[in-house]
């Protein structure tokens, strides 16, 4: 005999607040970590400590084709989604931490970095500090490509 389905519990949506100390019209900061490689763009918003994730959207979540994941358009859509979620939770301003792949790979941010930053600024979020946090090696492991490098 199949179990009865009468005692289903309705899931309640938890409303996250930033505490009672936030006054109306006060600027509340979050940290937007933008990781822009040449394959994808991540827009990840946390609280100021960086421990609590508020929202994380990637370019691959916004477009269907794999080749478009790192495009400026996908990054713009991802940033708009993140900004909307931040506003609903009461975050009005963002510090930006921009990151490229780094290490022994490229230190140049991908094509989505600029458009993600612009989309955050245009969606009425105040921008605090902008910082480049690309990992730069003090001494690196050997880069791939062999002795004579990548031949085109």
Swiss-Prot record:
State where composition is biased (Basic residues). 143-152
Region labeled Disordered — which residues?
A: 131-152
| Keyword line | Ribonucleoprotein, Ribosomal protein
GO CC, alphabetical: cytosolic small ribosomal subunit
Offer one example of a GO biological process linked to this entry: ribosomal small subunit assembly
Give one Pfam hit by family name: Ribosomal_S11
Question: GO terms for molecular function, please?
Answer: structural constituent of ribosome
InterPro entries membership: Ribosomal_uS11 (IPR001971), Ribosomal_uS11_CS (IPR018102), Ribosomal_uS11_sf (IPR036967)
Cross-referenced PROSITE patterns: RIBOSOMAL_S11 (PS00054)
Residue intervals passing through the bilayer? none
Claim: Cell membrane is one of the keywords in the record? no
Extract the HAMAP family matched here: Ribosomal_uS11
Q: Which PANTHER family match?
A: 40S RIBOSOMAL PROTEIN S14/30S RIBOSOMAL PROTEIN S11 (PTHR11759)
**Family affiliation:** Belongs to the universal ribosomal protein uS11 family.
Name under which the protein is recorded: Small ribosomal subunit protein uS11B
Native source organism of the sequence:
Anopheles gambiae (African malaria mosquito)
What lineage is this protein's organism placed in? Eukaryota, Metazoa, Ecdysozoa, Arthropoda, Hexapoda
């Amino acid at each position: 005999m199949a179990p009865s389905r009468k005692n289903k519990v309705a899931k309640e949506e938890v409303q996250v607040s930033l505490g009672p100390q936030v006054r109306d019209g006060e600027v509340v900061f979050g940290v937007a970590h933008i990781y822009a490689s040449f394959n994808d763009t991540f827009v990840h918003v946390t609280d100021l400590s960086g421990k609590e994730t508020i929202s994380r959207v990637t370019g691959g979540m916004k477009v269907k084709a794999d080749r478009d994941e790192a495009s400026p358009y996908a990054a713009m859509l991802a940033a708009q989604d993140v900004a909307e979620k931040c506003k609903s939770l009461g975050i009005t301003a963002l510090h930006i931490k921009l990151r490229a792949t780094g290490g022994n790979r490229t230190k140049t941010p991908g094509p989505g970095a600029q458009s993600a930053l612009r989309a955050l600024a245009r969606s009425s979020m105040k921008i605090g500090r902008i910082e480049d946090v690309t990992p730069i090696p003090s001494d690196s492991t050997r880069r791939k490509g062999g002795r004579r490098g990548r031949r085109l």
